[in-house]
Design a protein with these regions (language model features):
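S-adenosyl-L-methionine-dependent methyltransferase catalytic module, highlighting the catalytic core
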Residues: 93, 101-231
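Class I SAM-dependent methyltransferase SAM/SAH-binding core
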Residues: 30-83
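A short acidic, Gly/Pro-enriched loop at the edge of an enzyme's catalytic core
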Residues: 81-93
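Amphipathic, non-transmembrane alpha-helical secondary structure
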Residues: 15-22, 81, 127-131
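Class I SAM-dependent methyltransferase Rossmann-like catalytic core
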Residues: 1-24
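Short, conserved loop/helix-junction motifs that constitute active-site signature segments
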Residues: 24, 44-49, 136-138
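Receiver (REC) domain switch-region micro-motif
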Residues: 29, 92, 97
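Short, solvent-exposed loop/turn segments at secondary-structure junctions
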Residues: 9, 34-39, 59-63, 80-82, ...
Length: 232
């Protein structure tokens, strides 16, 4: 078993999603954006004794990686926007993932770029990913559990490619309105802030106001928006 010592944003993100799911559940779980088990998300689910777990990512799972060596979980290699909607899940977990959708990561497009155009992003791929999650919910007790960086910024890599969105009030509200269109709603919402990535405190939506922009780290997110979606 890997160490479950949590670091950085995972100090609040992982406890948040664990509080939303049952211990020892045999319900179906999907982890979006997971292929290498680097951030203690998968190990936390093992500690929670979740059994029926599937991972999905646009990247392949390494053959000699930790997940293949320590679990029998299925992996679906796919652009999540194209994910098969006949698959239904009780819990869909996305921890700091959708902010990368449609952008770049490790010099790789975080979408199926069949056009081959270098200077190209899909700005609303994140919202499409969240909508896709909603369509995979099994029933009204099922949950999509998401964390995203809150704030007014955008991160870029050394080549100038955008790699990470932050979510200000306007985009948060756009997500809330969009999921209403597919028969879903937020059933839980929390904000977390840390000045040093070690000591975290729970906040509220007031932290989204421009008067608090100065506390946001523009290089590494230090304000987290955590929320749960369910069918109406």
């Amino acid at each position: 078993m890997k160490s479950t010592v949590l670091k950085g944003t995972k100090k609040v993100e992982i406890p948040y999603f664990l509080n939303q799911i049952e211990h020892g559940t045999d319900k179906k779980v999907l982890i979006v954006g997971e292929c290498v088990a680097a951030d203690q998300i998968s190990t936390s689910l093992i500690d929670k004794e979740c059994k029926d777990v599937t991972t999905t990512d646009i990247r392949d799972r390494p053959e000699d990686g930790w997940l293949n060596s320590n679990t029998e979980w299925k992996h679906i290699n796919s652009d999540f926007i194209e994910f098969d909607e006949t698959n239904k899940y009780d819990y869909i977990i996305s921890i700091s993932v959708f902010e990368h959708f449609g952008l770049f990561w490790d010099n790789k497009s975080m979408f199926d770029n069949s056009t081959g155009v270098d200077d190209y992003i899909r700005w609303n791929h994140d919202i499409k990913g969240i909508v896709k999650s909603c369509k995979l919910l099994k029933d009204k007790d099922s949950k999509v559990i998401i964390t995203l960086p809150a704030g007014p910024f955008m991160n870029y890599n050394e080549s100038g490619h955008p790699i990470l969105r932050y979510y200000d009030t306007q985009r948060q509200n756009l997500i809330k309105e969009t999921i209403k269109g597919v028969g879903c709603k937020l059933t839980d919402e929390k904000f977390y802030y840390s000045p040093d990535y070690e000591n975290w405190s729970e906040s509220d939506s007031e932290i989204n106001q421009p008067k608090f922009y100065h506390i946001n780290n523009s290089y590494t997110p230090n304000v987290i928006w955590a929320f749960t979606i369910q069918k109406k």
